């Protein structure tokens, strides 16, 4: 077992899943955890960002941390089996596995892993993430990696699904220019504040997605100390790329808006590689968000 429950932990009086030292990712790789409200486009953002890093010559590994295991299919062009599914087939004897059993090569050489998750209502997502990282380390698959991206389930910030924050250098929060998305973002900021007490993770910034404007995001950023790292408008080619099971970099750049989206992803990847300054954002109380955003 790779994770333990201890008290006290990150939050005051809370019980959290803590990282087993044996699952620690070695220094050197840039590790990014991508969070955001459910359905906001985290997997699309993560996959396109992975592709952008690969375009910059980096060796990239993307780890999907969602029981739906659909994080990487635009990179691999198919749904791949999860780590948990594969481990169950060998009765959790990981020594019987080969890397090609659970890691798949996607667009432009991006390595793809889907951790999967426990059955609904059982188990812990943090344990699954820990098992995945442990398996990757056992097979020495993290040693030749420049960038690791964790694409994390929805806006669930319990101790389990906050586990990828224990491995990450930075967290990127994907949001839209609406109240519900920003409300979820505030909760994620709170989780990062808790994890940053004991782990190296820091806020990298915000990715504004599927939003023509960013006025509400800007208002929240100014109040909390966040910043927008990239802005993707509601370009139909992004939706169509998902339907075609491919990244935005595989779409015709002559299509309306495609080149601008590609350039924005490259810009985001470049900025993340340049030792982006971590943010010391301060979350708001729920009532403060209601007062800040609309509701005049």
From Swiss-Prot:
Pfam families noted in UniProt: Fer4_NifH
Residues binding Mg(2+), per UniProt: 43
Pathway linked to the protein: Porphyrin-containing compound metabolism; chlorophyll biosynthesis (light-independent)
Cofactor: [4Fe-4S] cluster
Xref: Gene3D superfamilies: P-loop containing nucleotide triphosphate hydrolases (3.40.50.300)
Signal sequence residues: none
Official protein name in the record: Light-independent protochlorophyllide reductase iron-sulfur ATP-binding protein
Species of the source: Synechococcus sp. (strain CC9311)
Gene for this chain: chlL
């Amino acid at each position: 077992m790779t994770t333990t429950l201890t008290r006290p932990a990150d939050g005051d009086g809370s019980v959290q899943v803590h990282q087993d030292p044996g699952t620690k990712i070695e220094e050197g790789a840039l590790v990014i955890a991508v969070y955001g409200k459910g359905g906001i486009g985290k997997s699309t953002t993560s996959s396109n960002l992975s592709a952008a890093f690969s375009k910059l010559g980096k060796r990239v590994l993307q780890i999907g941390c969602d029981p739906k295991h659909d994080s990487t299919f635009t990179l691999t062009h198919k749904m791949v089996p999860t780590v948990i599914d594969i481990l169950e087939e060998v009765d959790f004897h990981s020594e019987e596995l080969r890397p090609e059993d659970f890691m798949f090569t996607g667009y432009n050489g991006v390595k793809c892993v889907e951790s999967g998750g426990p059955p609904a209502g059982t188990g812990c997502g943090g344990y699954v993430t820990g098992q995945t990282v442990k398996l990757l380390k056992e097979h020495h698959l993290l040693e030749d990696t420049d960038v690791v991206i964790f694409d994390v389930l929805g806006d669930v910030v319990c101790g389990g699904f906050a586990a990828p924050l224990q491995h990450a250098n930075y967290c990127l929060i994907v949001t839209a220019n609406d109240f519900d998305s920003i409300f979820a973002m505030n909760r994620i900021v709170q989780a990062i504040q808790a994890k940053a007490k004991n782990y190296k993770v820091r806020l990298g910034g915000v990715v504004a997605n599927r939003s023509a404007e960013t006025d509400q995001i800007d208002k929240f950023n100014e109040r909390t100390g966040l910043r927008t790292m990239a802005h993707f408008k509601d370009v139909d080619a992004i939706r169509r790329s998902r339907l075609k099971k491919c990244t935005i970099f595989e779409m015709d750049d002559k299509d309306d808006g495609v080149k601008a989206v590609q350039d924005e992803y490259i810009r985001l990847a470049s900025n993340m590689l340049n030792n982006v300054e971590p943010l010391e954002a301060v979350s708001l109380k729920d009532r403060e968000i209601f007062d800040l955003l609309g509701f005049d």
